[in-house]
């Protein structure tokens, strides 16, 4: 009579096989167990897969955001985040978002000095929220701000639906009307105007140019000082005055000046402040954002649907519970990463035939 041996399913951090079975007579497969080492069994089921790189996809069972504004054609995410004319559309809500613009990108209205602020992070900050909307009202009256009255500057590289010249909807380029003189630092309070308890993302900045242009626009060709403060974070800037080479953005007009753009996050009910001199870009429409969207670095376009979004492999469908290969951030219904392949023995343990006893 054959003895029956039962191998229990064992999972340990040191094991690279999972095994279960009973005695049998043939053994084309070898598995490794925690208690008995290598064991011959008659059949196994692979539990791991090694994915190949593929396109990213929409995550099954949830809304996935690729571009901030899918219907804003020929617009970068920075265009949308700054509310460039012709790039103002609805940002759909999403539980998951793809971070796809990993390098600094430009915005067509005006040459931006990316290296002086964290503005390149603004699209990704917005992408991390589930719900994002642009306010319908301006946060301050820029024309009557301290140091005014101001006229609001525009750029021929920023045409909108009604004019051949415009500017970002999130900022007002404050150019003195009559009082083109130097000024001591001025302060404007930025109220909280979001209505649903959201975070308020307020965009602001300043313009600088060569000395002759600064004198013509503002009456002061010296470097100007700027400070923003909100939610316990204070940032200081001094404008850079110099002869910048003419630069054309997105097929627009050559620009001799540059703008520095920054943002501050205001929590519900909290007021921010901006201290400024000449050349300020005062905040106008603000972003109201709430909820959290899981963010993963990927590439566009999003094609089809997938169970899992993996930073290295793209969209994955969970065909097996484990995977090998590159370990990276993943979101969704994802297989578990393991270092070496796992197998489940569904056959029986091999036992060599017993030797015949000599008759006496």
From Swiss-Prot:
<dbReference type="GO" id="GO:0046718">
    <property type="term" value="P:symbiont entry into host cell"/>
</dbReference>
<keyword id="KW-0261">Viral envelope protein</keyword>
<keyword id="KW-1032">Host cell membrane</keyword>
<feature type="glycosylation site" description="N-linked (GlcNAc...) asparagine; by host">
    <location>
        <position position="346"/>
    </location>
</feature>
<keyword id="KW-1168">Fusion of virus membrane with host membrane</keyword>
<keyword id="KW-0325">Glycoprotein</keyword>
<feature type="glycosylation site" description="N-linked (GlcNAc...) asparagine; by host">
    <location>
        <position position="246"/>
    </location>
</feature>
<keyword id="KW-0472">Membrane</keyword>
<keyword id="KW-1170">Fusion of virus membrane with host endosomal membrane</keyword>
<dbReference type="InterPro" id="IPR001364">
    <property type="entry name" value="Hemagglutn_influenz_A/B"/>
</dbReference>
<keyword id="KW-1043">Host membrane</keyword>
<feature type="glycosylation site" description="N-linked (GlcNAc...) asparagine; by host">
    <location>
        <position position="74"/>
    </location>
</feature>
<dbReference type="GO" id="GO:0019064">
    <property type="term" value="P:fusion of virus membrane with host plasma membrane"/>
</dbReference>
<dbReference type="GO" id="GO:0055036">
    <property type="term" value="C:virion membrane"/>
</dbReference>
<keyword id="KW-1162">Viral penetration into host cytoplasm</keyword>
<keyword id="KW-1015">Disulfide bond</keyword>
<dbReference type="GO" id="GO:0039654">
    <property type="term" value="P:fusion of virus membrane with host endosome membrane"/>
</dbReference>
<dbReference type="GO" id="GO:0016020">
    <property type="term" value="C:membrane"/>
</dbReference>
<comment type="subunit">
    <text>Homotrimer of disulfide-linked HA1-HA2.</text>
</comment>
<feature type="glycosylation site" description="N-linked (GlcNAc...) asparagine; by host">
    <location>
        <position position="40"/>
    </location>
</feature>
<feature type="signal peptide">
    <location>
        <begin position="1"/>
        <end position="15"/>
    </location>
</feature>
<comment type="function">
    <text>Binds to sialic acid-containing receptors on the cell surface, bringing about the attachment of the virus particle to the cell. Plays a major role in the determination of host range restriction and virulence. Class I viral fusion protein. Responsible for penetration of the virus into the cell cytoplasm by mediating the fusion of the membrane of the endocytosed virus particle with the endosomal membrane. Low pH in endosomes induce an irreversible conformational change in HA2, releasing the fusion hydrophobic peptide. Several trimers are required to form a competent fusion pore.</text>
</comment>
<keyword id="KW-0812">Transmembrane</keyword>
<feature type="glycosylation site" description="N-linked (GlcNAc...) asparagine; by host">
    <location>
        <position position="160"/>
    </location>
</feature>
<keyword id="KW-0564">Palmitate</keyword>
<keyword id="KW-0945">Host-virus interaction</keyword>
<dbReference type="Pfam" id="PF00509">
    <property type="entry name" value="Hemagglutinin"/>
</dbReference>
<feature type="glycosylation site" description="N-linked (GlcNAc...) asparagine; by host">
    <location>
        <position position="317"/>
    </location>
</feature>
<protein>
    <recommendedName>
        <fullName>Hemagglutinin</fullName>
    </recommendedName>
</protein>
<keyword id="KW-0946">Virion</keyword>
<dbReference type="GO" id="GO:0046789">
    <property type="term" value="F:host cell surface receptor binding"/>
</dbReference>
<keyword id="KW-0732">Signal</keyword>
<dbReference type="GO" id="GO:0019062">
    <property type="term" value="P:virion attachment to host cell"/>
</dbReference>
<keyword id="KW-0348">Hemagglutinin</keyword>
<dbReference type="GO" id="GO:0019031">
    <property type="term" value="C:viral envelope"/>
</dbReference>
<comment type="similarity">
    <text>Belongs to the influenza viruses hemagglutinin family.</text>
</comment>
<keyword id="KW-0449">Lipoprotein</keyword>
<keyword id="KW-1161">Viral attachment to host cell</keyword>
<dbReference type="InterPro" id="IPR013828">
    <property type="entry name" value="Hemagglutn_HA1_a/b_dom_sf"/>
</dbReference>
<keyword id="KW-1160">Virus entry into host cell</keyword>
<dbReference type="GO" id="GO:0020002">
    <property type="term" value="C:host cell plasma membrane"/>
</dbReference>
<dbReference type="InterPro" id="IPR008980">
    <property type="entry name" value="Capsid_hemagglutn"/>
</dbReference>
């Amino acid at each position: 009579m054959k003895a029956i041996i039962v191998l229990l399913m064992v999972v340990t951090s040191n094991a690279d096989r999972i095994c279960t079975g009973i005695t049998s007579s043939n053994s084309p497969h070898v598995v490794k167990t925690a208690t008995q080492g290598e064991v011959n069994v008659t059949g196994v089921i692979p539990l791991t897969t090694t994915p190949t790189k593929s396109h990213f996809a929409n995550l099954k069972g949830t809304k996935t955001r690729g571009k901030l504004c899918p219907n804003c054609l020929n617009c970068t995410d920075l265009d949308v985040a700054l509310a460039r004319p012709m790039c103002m559309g609805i940002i759909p809500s999403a539980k998951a978002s793809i971070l796809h613009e990993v390098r600094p990108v430009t915005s067509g209205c005006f040459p931006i000095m990316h290296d002086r602020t964290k503005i390149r992070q603004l699209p990704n900050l917005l992408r991390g929220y589930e719900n994002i909307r642009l306010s319908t009202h301006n946060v301050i009256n820029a024309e009557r701000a301290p140091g005014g009255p101001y006229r609001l500057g525009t750029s021929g590289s920023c045409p909108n639906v009604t004019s051949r010249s415009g500017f970002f909807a999130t900022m007002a380029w404050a150019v003195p009307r009559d009082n083109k003189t130097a000024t001591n630092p001025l302060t404007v309070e930025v109220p909280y105007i979001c209505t649903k308890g959201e975070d308020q993302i307020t965009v602001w900045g300043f313009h600088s140019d060569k000395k002759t242009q600064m004198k013509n626009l503002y009456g002061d060709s010296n470097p100007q000082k700027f400070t923003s403060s909100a939610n316990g974070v204070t940032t200081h800037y001094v404008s850079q005055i110099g002869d910048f080479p003419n630069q054309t953005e997105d097929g627009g007009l050559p620009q001799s000046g540059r703008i520095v753009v920054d943002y501050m996050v205001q929590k519900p009910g909290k007021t921010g402040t901006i201290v400024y001199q000449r050349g300020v870009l005062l905040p106008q429409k603000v972003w109201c954002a709430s909820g959290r969207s899981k963010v993963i670095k990927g590439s566009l376009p999003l094609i089809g649907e997938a169970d899992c979004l993996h930073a290295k492999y793209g969209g994955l469908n969970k065909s097996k519970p484990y995977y090998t290969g590159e370990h990276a951030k993943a979101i969704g219904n994802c297989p578990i990463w393991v270092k070496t392949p796992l197998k489940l023995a569904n056959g029986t343990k091999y036992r060599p035939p017993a030797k015949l006893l000599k008759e006496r």
